[in-house]
Amino acid sequence: MDPSPFTRRDFLVRSAFLAGSSALLPGYRFNIGAARPRLSETIIGQGDHRYRVELGWGDLDRATTPVENCHEMVMDSRGRLLMVTDEPRNNVLIYDKGGELLASWTLGYNAAHGLTLSEEGDEEFLYLAHNGFSDTGRVVKTTLDGRVVQTLPHPAEIGVYEADDNYHPTETAIAPNGDIYVADGYGSHWILHFSAAGEFIRRFGGRGDADEQFQTPHGITVDYRDPAGPTLLVTSRAHNAFKRFTLDGQYLSTLFLPGAFVCRPVLRGDTLYAGVCWSRLRDLNQTPNSGFVTILDRSGRVISNPGGTAPEYRNGELQLMVQETPVFKHCHDVCVDDEENLYVCQWNADRSYPIKLHRVG
């Protein structure tokens, strides 16, 4: 059971609409007293993807709107930035691009981790993955204001897992037909494929070092960039890699990113972005506080590493990438806005709020 006063059915909405907001609902409150952000002189990244760091962009009053870890962020059709945290008082914070808090809500989860935005007709929904380290993992679909509309079945309840198999989901992806893929990144390392209605279809992957297996499938997304048809990109974090699969789970290829313990792949246009939680900075080991951001072009070539060493290829092979400028501790996700600025969420970073990177090149 979560060590919070909330249950699955509990729902609490808090928001902080500023002057000019269209509505104020009961229980909403203003956000007062947050320190104003400032631009740093630091510019990070290489080539056409260089960024100026904005310090304190999303800082809030810790007494009223605390965070534990800032796990992931998405941008909705209105340009709002929705971020998931594992602080049970504030599972989702909703910002504008200026760093002002617009709203917050919670399901009381103390291990909320993955956040995926899905457009379904004229509506948008969120898929939230709850690790469930202290109780049980679950994946729920919600409206943008936090109303649960669907809960996927636990794999042990439908005979997909044995009763003692670990289930700690980290991410979801939604196919063009509405099918749902769940990455059990902190559990048994399977990708679970469900229909839009929540009916189990198949699983693939599992823990191991074969091409079609994973070591921490932390993230997953549907890649629409190939005109031949969409595919799945799945993180294999301990392998420092993304692995590509067909939508029915057939392995296609591996994109090796030496030194980079990448989180989920994030696509905008032809470009792929990812937070790097750790790099192999010391003796080729996973090093604490060594994160950065990595950016790849459509061909899978790394073109910039904000906070990291410049990408280098020798005889067509990517060389070791590590942190160079200590702007970040552990980058857990990247959100890209409509001006191609970046918002970086961090895990294990002293309960810090997101960092904004303004694109300058």
Language-model-derived ranges and their functions:
Residues 2-4, 10-32:
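N-terminal export signals
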Residues 55-64, 149-163, 167, 201-212, ...:
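Surface-exposed loop and turn segments in beta-propeller and other repeat-based domains
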Residues 81-83, 125-127, 180-181, 231-233, ...:
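Conserved beta-propeller blade signature
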Residues 35-55:
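Blade/loop signatures of beta-propeller domains
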Residues 260-309:
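Loop/turn-rich, solvent-exposed surfaces of beta-rich toroidal or solenoidal domains
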